[in-house]
């Protein structure tokens, strides 16, 4: 079977696990942006995320970001000196979700 299709099937299964609150496709894209920037030690601010036109309109991004925060996937780093910016970071649940997807990708490549 195609490794990509295996991954898609495994990822859908992960998304349906009870410990991971449901996310929309757009929320997953936003979560990916937050995770990638955090990994590069350059966390996105709320303002930077909202300004990425390729994702959606600012209002739509803000709505989905609020859902991600309420669901516990994303938080704001409060341990910064400049209180004018609000860097977005993955929460432990966000890291667990990304780790589960990573394991699914590795598993799909072994088949």
Language-model segments: which ranges?
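Intrinsically disordered, low-complexity serine/threonine- and proline-rich regulatory segments
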Residues: 1-20
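A generic fold-level signal
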Residues: 2, 23-25, 82
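Amphipathic alpha-helical dimerization/coiled-coil segments
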Residues: 6, 14-15, 99-111
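N-terminal helix-turn-helix DNA-binding core of bacterial DNA-binding proteins
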Residues: 16-56
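Residues within the helices of the helix-turn-helix
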Residues: 46-48, 66, 86
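Short amphipathic alpha-helical interaction segments
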Residues: 55-70
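Beta-hairpin "wing" of winged helix-turn-helix
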Residues: 71-84
